[in-house]
Curated annotation (Swiss-Prot):
Pfam families: DUF4599, FAM75. Disulfide bonds: none annotated. It is found in: Membrane. InterPro entries: SPATA31, SPATA31F3-like. It comes from Homo sapiens (Human). Residues 138-154, 960-976 have a biased composition (Basic and acidic residues). GO terms for cellular component: membrane. The keyword Nucleus does not apply. One of its GO terms (biological process) is spermatogenesis. The gene is SPATA31C1. May play a role in spermatogenesis. Keywords: Differentiation, Membrane, Spermatogenesis, Transmembrane, Transmembrane helix. Residues 495-510, 783-800, 943-954, 1121-1130 have a biased composition (Polar residues). This is Spermatogenesis-associated protein 31C1.
Length: 1188
């Protein structure tokens, strides 16, 4: 106290000894507080003024302006310079709005200041706040009343106080701002505290002193803690020592000293280092001596406050920014609860330079509204106070007094490698001061101190709950979770401790001491167990009920609520809340599920659970429940949602099972629906396909037709059905495929031979009506089984029967439709058989009979041909199945076709039936009856059927064969249909009617839907159109016939047609064929002569179709040529002649063949008159067959 002026000492002694000074000090303190509030209120305004119009500092103060300007400019937004002053009002308002927050922060600081000053005043160590004496000199306590001249030099203290002293603006000794403080210990003498600057509107912030030197090692000397401190005022009785830091009004006596300006004589000397105003702005520079003492105390208070605030602030900021090194210098936690001079515990906060710098930065960030006057003292006191603390620390070295400190330091050093959460808990205990009673947390400020309740709560929150309780309890929770840390078990949880702060503080102290006594094992446990424990904590989080199935989580979900564990209570509460929500949700979804509604959210959620849950089951063990063994674990809701009712779980599981079944099989089922539809449609076609065999060849005739027929003999029924689908909707038999043996190929070959120019697509597109009929025309599909179809002949025959069953309507009456197509078919058959059609028996393409009478005839024919077909099927392995499309759209399989009768049936048997108009339906009936009676002699019928089918098939294949053959066939079919419709009509009438029917019915056939009911009508119209077209276009037929054999007579051609019919229908016994040849030999010769002599002439002796195969083919070719020419020249005449001749031929055949062979007779008769048109379509086919 030698350096203190006398008035200050006197004032200090009087203030310390006079208890009555308490009210006065309190008033002064309150005045200071309000002055600070006003200053903060006006400071933003001044700062904005300074930003808008910054004054040019004098050279003397330029450096000081530098720092302050930096601070102020940082507050000023960019671009504020030169802004209109009219907008300053807004800034002022904003500053005013910020003032309350600044005031609150000020109150906070002041309250902390009082809380820190309390222990000093209680212990009577008022003078201990002063800094230590120069090194090597032990300060002595001056007696009460001691005085010194105020002008006494302060040489001994000046060089030491340089870091703290700040030059008075009015002093004549400019300070070197760049000077650095000396490395020795530093003292905060009164002179350093007296250098306070007067408040200025634009308070300049001195640049903070450089980084403090290494003053923190323990000083070698132990100065008297009372040295260099002003004596307590007279009459002042220090309060008894207390273990509490509670501040009472008496504690504020020494703080609320009047603050006046400091005399200039007390300013530091020139050699003082760079410093900062201690409490600039708090008072004027001209003040009484008493103000100096107050300033001294205030500065000392700031020093202590800085240390304490740093501790508290570091405790709050340790999570993110504070370095563990800072806590190495905070061994306060080792102090016991015994009473000690506060100065002996406070200096123990010995931050390193780095830690001190961090603390300063944190203080700046934590108190942004503080004026530079407050920031600089806190910075400087943070540097200077440790100097005085070091003196006191020297009195009691920590190594001697507290041998356990090195262990704690080591433990804290090891905290660098600890997880963040563990570091936080460690930091809490390292920063906490258990020597302070628990009341400090609840009552930081005196009860009568004017602090708002909100600020009070904030102080308690930051200094108490967050700084000490919560973190300590976090560590306790971690230790409780750790298997080996049973010490922390049984201790209150954070929430319970927050309610009872005292107990939690004591427990925190206990835990801290335990860590201090044995830090290494716990540290090892923390290091080894924390990550696992943290992962367990994450798994046990209630929000992961669905995903976490570990033993820990299950135990946490099922363990009873601990009465002494707040965390368990919260966890249980959260779990109950989640369970309630899930129960409500599941109840709602259960109702929806029962109603048949499956919410999308439930689906997705369970899908996600199914994906995540089995994965956890692979590596997680469940203690209470067996782990699911398959991906069906998601269904096992008992594991995941054990809190649900059993009924709800069962329903949910059943729902999940159904959902997964739908999810897995829904798409296949949706795909199977159309497949089933196809299967239903293929019922009839399936048998045909089977009959057709696995041959991969497709009937080119069918392909040539507008209807795309894919023979899927080797493919599955579904694929075959798909391929069988007709491209044109007009075609009504996408499913009906006519299994054709090589005969089909032969038919195709024949049209191939026919020039494509003559063929307008499959069937020459006749008129518009005819074009529409073309698609409907090729109603019969021939599946080229080639000779391979021969395999499974019996099966094919049976399949043919099945096909018949599938097709409700019987096979097309071969005697009728086949007659129309017979000539072409027989010609084609001849053409095919000439090169060896026996093996490649032409599968008779069953032509669709338009007339129900034709259907009946076809039924009869089929029934008649079946025996012969079966016989020949046995003889020949080739399978030729003829699918007859009935008017109803149903297809009938002609077993004779499957048997490839054509191969076995001699061509002589294949008699061309008059495809022209069968005038007399009676004749047809007779033929059918004859067929019925002569089942064994139905070879001619079969050939007729084959011929008809083949004629249709050649016509049906849209290839050249069809077009060429169709031209004559059209005429023939027209005549035939007319004959069927009006069998009694004369040839002329029939021809006209046929044309009319063609013009009228063929057009409706286009319009008619593909329904089976109108299918026959469409077929009729189609054939009529074809016939008419063929009549109109017989040239291609003629060309083909010329290509084949022009020397053959029409009779031979008719016999060839008969052969084709025989081949298509089935194998006809050779005896019948020989008989037919014998009977019709003369007639065939006559017909040949007739055909050869007049090209247009038509042999009436079609009754002799059973001529030698070769002769038949030749005659057929000649007849077809002649018929073609004749049809071209005079189609009407030819038709009439055909109509007449078929009648005659039918009659003759009936007479000759009797009832046994009505078909043969009919083909013969029909062939003779109708052979030209029939030969026309069939001539091309036959010729083409011959060529091929």
């Amino acid at each position: 106290m030698e350096n203190l002026p006398f008035p200050l000492k006197l004032l200090s002694a009087s203030s310390l000894n006079t208890p009555s000074s308490t009210p006065w000090v309190l008033d002064i303190f309150l005045t200071l507080v309000f002055a600070l509030g006003l200053f903060f209120l006006l400071l933003p305004y001044f700062s904005y003024l300074r930003c808008d119009n910054p004054p040019s500092p004098s050279p003397r103060k330029r450096k000081r302006h530098l720092v302050s300007q930096r601070h102020l400019v940082s507050q000023c937004p960019t671009g504020r310079r030169g802004r209109p002053r009219g907008r300053m009002k807004n800034h002022s308002l904003r500053a005013c709005r910020e003032c309350p927050r600044g005031l609150e922060e000020t109150w906070d600081l002041l309250s902390q200041l009082q809380s820190l000053l309390g222990p000093h005043l209680e212990k009577g160590d008022f003078g201990q706040l002063s800094g230590p004496d120069p090194p090597g000199e032990v300060g002595k306590r001056t007696p009460d009343g001691a005085s010194r001249s105020s002008h006494e030099p302060m040489e001994d203290a000046a060089p030491i106080v340089s870091p703290l002293a700040s030059p008075d603006p009015r002093t004549k000794h400019p300070q070197d701002l760049a000077s650095t403080p000396p490395p020795g210990p530093m003292t905060t003498s009164v002179s350093s505290l007296s250098a306070s600057q007067p408040p200025e509107p634009s308070l300049l912030l001195e640049r903070p002193s450089p980084e403090p030197p290494a003053l923190f090692p323990h000083p070698p000397h132990t100065p008297d803690p009372l040295a260099c401190s002003p004596p307590p005022p007279k009459g002042f009785t220090p309060p008894p020592l207390r273990d509490s830091t509670l501040l009472t009004p008496s504690h504020c006596d020494s703080v609320a000293l009047p603050l006046d300006t400091v005399p200039q004589s007390l300013s530091p000397r020139e050699d003082l280092a760079a410093s900062v105003p201690a409490i600039s702005g708090l008072g004027g520079s001209n003040s009484q001596v008493s103000a100096l003492s107050w300033s001294q105390e205030t500065t000392k208070t700031w020093c202590i406050f800085n240390s304490s605030v740093q501790q508290d602030h570091l405790s709050r900021q340790r999570d993110t920014t504070m370095s563990p090194l800072l806590f190495q210098a905070q061994p306060l936690s080792h102090l016991g609860p015994e009473s000690q001079p506060f100065i002996s515990s406070t200096p123990q906060f010995r931050p390193t330079p780095m830690a001190q710098a961090e603390a300063q930065a944190h203080l700046q960030s934590s108190f942004p509204v503080l004026s530079p006057a407050f920031l600089s003292p806190m910075k400087n006191t943070g540097v200077a106070c440790p100097a005085s603390q070091n003196k006191v620390q020297a009195l009691s070295l920590p190594e001697t007094q507290h041998p356990e400190r090195p262990l704690l330091r080591k433990q804290l050093e090891g905290g660098l490698a600890l997880p963040s959460r563990v570091q936080k808990s460690q930091d809490v205990f390292s920063v906490s001061t258990p020597n302070l009673p628990q009341e400090r947390l609840t009552s930081i400020l005196p009860e009568n101190f004017p602090v708002s309740p909100e600020l009070w709560r904030q102080l308690e929150q930051y200094m108490g709950q967050r700084g000490r309780i919560q973190e300590s309890l976090d560590l306790m929770q971690l230790q409780d979770e750790l298997p080996g840390t049973s010490q922390a078990k049984g201790k209150p949880r954070p929430w319970q401790s927050s309610t009872s702060t005292g107990e939690s503080s004591k427990e925190a102290q206990t835990v801290k001491f335990q860590l201090e006594r044995d830090p290494c094992p716990h540290l090892g446990q923390i290091l080894g167990e924390t990550p696992q424990n943290l992962s367990r904590g994450m798994e046990s989080f209630p929000g992961k009920v669905l995903g976490a199935t570990s033993e820990e989580s299950e135990r946490n979900l099922r363990k009873p609520l601990r009465s002494d564990s707040g965390s368990d209570l919260l966890r249980r509460t959260e779990r109950n809340h989640i369970e309630n929500i899930l129960k409500a949700h599941m109840g709602r979804k259960l109702g929806q599920t029962n109603e048949g509604l499956i919410p999308v959210s439930v689906r997705r959620s369970w899908l996600a659970v199914n994906q995540a849950f089995p994965v956890s089951n692979t590596h997680v063990k469940t203690s209470n429940l067996a782990a699911p063994k398959s991906r069906k674990a998601c269904v096992n809701t008992a594991q995941v949602l054990s809190f649900l009712e059993l009924c709800t779980q069962q329903v949910l599981e059943a729902h999940i099972v159904r959902f997964w079944a739908k999810h897995r099989w829904g798409l296949p089922l949706r795909v199977l629906k159309p497949i089933q539809c196809f299967q239903l449609e293929k019922v009839s076609s399936l048998s045909l396909i089977q009959l057709a065999g696995p041959s991969s060849d497709t009937c080119e005739s069918g392909a040539g037709s507008k209807v795309e027929v894919a023979t899927l003999l080797g493919e599955p029924p579904m694929a075959s059905l798909r391929k069988q689908v007709l491209t044109k909707p007009s075609v009504h038999m996408p499913e009906r495929l006519q299994a054709s043996s090589p005969a089909c190929k032969q038919f195709q070959r024949a049209p191939r031979g026919i020039p494509s120019s003559n063929d307008h697509g499959s069937l020459k597109a006749p008129t518009a009506g005819q074009e529409g009929r073309w698609p409907s025309k090729p109603l019969t599909y021939s599946l080229k089984g080639s000779t391979q179809q021969s395999r499974s002949l019996g099966a094919q025959s049976s399949r043919a029967g099945e096909t018949r069953e599938a097709v409700p309507q019987p096979t097309v009456p071969l005697g009728t439709c086949m007659r129309a197509n017979l000539q072409a078919t027989s010609e084609d058959v001849r053409g095919f058989k000439a090169p060896g059609a026996s093996k490649s028996s032409l599968l008779p393409r069953m032509s669709v009979s338009q007339d129900p009478r034709k259907l009946c005839l076809m039924e009869e024919a089929v029934s008649e041909f079946e025996p012969g077909m079966a016989t020949k099927s046995e003889t020949q392995p080739q399978v030729s199945a003829a699918v007859v499309l009935l008017p109803d759209g149903q297809a009938s399989v002609v077993p004779h076709a499957s048997e490839n009768l054509a191969s076995q049936v001699p061509q002589g048997h294949l008699q061309s039936t008059p495809t022209g108009n069968m005038q007399a339906s009676q004749e047809l009936c007779d033929l059918m009856s004859a067929r019925r009676s002569n089942m064994g002699h139905k070879e001619p019928r079969n050939p007729n059927c084959q011929g008809s089918c083949k004629s249709q098939s050649p016509m049906f294949p849209p290839t050249h064969k069809r077009e060429n053959s169709r031209k004559p066939n059209l005429e023939k079919h027209e005549e035939m249909f007319q004959g069927l419709r009006t069998p009694q009509l004369t040839p002329g009438r029939k021809t006209e009617d046929t044309r009319q029917n063609e013009g009228v019915q063929l057009l409706p056939s286009k319009k008619q839907p593909p329904s089976i009911s109108h299918f026959g009508e469409n077929i009729k119209q189609f054939f009529e159109t074809i016939f008419s077209k063929k009549e109109r276009k017989p040239a291609p037929v003629t060309a083909e016939s010329q290509k084949t054999v022009k020397n053959r007579s029409c009779v031979y051609g008719s016999s060839a047609e008969a052969e084709r019919l025989m081949t298509a229908v089935g194998q006809i016994p050779e005896e019948n064929m020989s008989l037919c040849h014998a009977r019709h030999a003369s007639k065939v010769n006559q017909q040949r002569q007739q055909f050869q002599a007049p090209v247009c002439g038509f042999p009436c002796n079609h009754r002799h179709p059973f001529y030698s195969d070769h002769s038949r083919m030749l005659s057929y070719a000649a007849s077809s040529q002649q018929a073609t020419l004749k049809n071209q020249s005079r189609p009407n005449r030819d038709r009439q002649i055909r109509d007449q001749q078929p009648l005659k031929s039918v009659r003759c055949n009936n007479e000759q063949w009797g009832l046994r062979h009505p078909q043969l007779l009919l083909p013969k008769k029909a062939v003779s008159p109708v052979s030209p048109p029939q030969h026309r379509p069939k001539t091309p086919s036959a010729s083409s067959h011959h060529h091929h």
